[in-house]
């Protein structure tokens, strides 16, 4: 009796193992680009302060990332009619894959060299912006592409 139950369990396990690849073949989607979305709110009276940062330092950094092939695009979206508690802006970045730790460190070093700032200076600048700019949300999404 014990061997019959064991055989039945093994057969059921095999059934599930075989059906998983079949289900994957039927999935009409495959993963595409990753999309990073950061929701940012800006205190009243500080729009131009943050807009100046975005049009200078931020734009240069994002353009550098595209030139290096690290990301495919970026955009800034304005929340035209934000409800209470919603961000004013969404910073959107698209990229093909996630770097491993070593590659991430290499990229950070290249960015610091490009902007001529060390980590302490970059953190201090971020802290200065945090007086009027607040990161409300961060999402990492993945594009769902149709299989052909």
For the regions a protein language model found, what residue spans apply to each?
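Short beta-strand/turn micro-motifs at beta-sheet edges
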Residues: 24-28, 77-80
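Hydrophobic pocket/interface hotspot
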Residues: 38, 50, 91, 101
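Acidic/histidine-rich, surface-exposed loop or edge segments in extracytoplasmic proteins
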Residues: 30-45
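Short, solvent-exposed mixed-charge patches
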Residues: 147-148
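An amphipathic, aromatic/His-enriched active-site/gating alpha helix that lines ligand/cofactor pockets
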Residues: 26-29, 60, 64-72, 94-141
């Amino acid at each position: 009796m014990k061997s019959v139950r064991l055989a039945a369990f093994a057969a059921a396990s095999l059934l599930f193992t075989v059906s998983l690849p079949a289900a994957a073949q039927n999935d009409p989607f495959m993963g595409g680009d990753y999309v990073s979305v950061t929701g940012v709110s800006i205190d009243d009276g500080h729009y131009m302060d943050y807009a100046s940062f975005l049009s200078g330092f931020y734009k240069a950094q994002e353009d550098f990332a595209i030139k290096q092939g690290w990301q495919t695009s970026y955009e800034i979206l304005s929340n035209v009619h934000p409800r209470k508690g919603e961000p004013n802006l969404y910073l959107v970045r698209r990229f093909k894959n996630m770097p491993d730790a070593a590659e991430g460190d290499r990229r950070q070093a290249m960015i610091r060299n490009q902007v001529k700032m060390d980590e302490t200076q970059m953190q201090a600048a971020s802290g200065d912006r945090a007086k009027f700019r607040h990161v409300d949300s961060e999402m990492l999404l993945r594009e769902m592409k149709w299989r052909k």
